[in-house]
A protein has these predicted regions:
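N-terminal beta1-alpha1 cap of cysteine-dependent amidohydrolase-like domains
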Residues: 1-106
Length: 106
């Protein structure tokens, strides 16, 4: 990529398929995306954030074994119309050590 696109080697960041979108920030930080952006913008590079609370959230999300089933009755067929509801239920499940399985009811 660096040879054909005139991009510095340290600015090539691999966007991998991950099990969850919530793992993307940790993956990008591990590859140095934050440092590369600050360097390109001419900003001072300080201490790398530890992302402790974020990693704790991921650990809780990944270790949850109990499942709670929720039926969601909605007006629209397109499930994206209920994205915020799905995400908020998912977050609530994570903080209560549960995986949330949502069944859409038409």
């Amino acid at each position: 990529v660096t040879s054909f696109c005139n991009v510095d080697l340290d600015c090539v960041i691999q966007s991998e398929d991950l099990p969850s979108i919530y793992e993307v920030p940790v993956n990008m930080q591990n590859q140095g995306l934050d440092t590369a952006i600050l360097r390109k913008m001419g900003e001072p590079i300080g201490e790398t954030p530890a992302l402790g609370p974020w990693k704790t959230f991921l650990a809780r999300r990944n270790k949850a074994t109990e499942v709670v089933n929720i039926g969601l009755v909605g007006k629209y067929d397109l499930q994206d119309a209920y994205k915020s509801i799905r995400e908020s239920l998912s977050h609530a499940g994570t903080y209560n050590d549960h995986k949330v399985k949502i069944t859409f009811i038409n």
